[in-house]
Curated annotation (Swiss-Prot):
SUPFAM superfamilies, per the entry: Ribosomal protein S20
Region (Disordered): 1-26
Summary of the function given for this chain in its UniProt record: Binds directly to 16S ribosomal RNA.
Record keyword Methyltransferase present: no
Organism: Idiomarina loihiensis (strain ATCC BAA-735 / DSM 15497 / L2-TR)
Classification via InterPro entries: Ribosomal_bS20, Ribosomal_bS20_sf
Name listed for the protein in its UniProt record: Small ribosomal subunit protein bS20
Length: 86
């Protein structure tokens, strides 16, 4: 454990941010699973609705640095391709 006050504070902040980011990553994965589940059941309407929720979320997390912008683009591209194939 750190001895310097500022290092202790940064350790606490890092842990707080880690928990927050883990929560956001979990939520993102859940929403991605919803889109994939709709695609699996071949429900285009539900897939489009779920995609409308996921796309801005991916962009937001890419902007905030939770995921890279390429990863966000890759997810959106692949999901849209799967939806169009229905």
């Amino acid at each position: 454990m750190a001895n310097i006050k500022s290092a202790k504070k940064r350790a606490i902040q890092a842990e707080k941010n880690r928990r927050h980011n883990a929560s956001r990553r979990s939520m993102m994965r859940t929403y991605l699973k919803r889109v994939n589940a709709a695609i699996e059941t071949k429900d285009k309407e539900a897939a489009n609705t779920a995609m409308k929720d996921v796309a801005p979320m991916l962009d937001r997390y890419a902007t905030k640095g939770l995921i890279s912008k390429n990863k966000a683009a890759r997810h959106k591209s692949r999901l849209n391709a799967k939806i169009k194939a229905l």
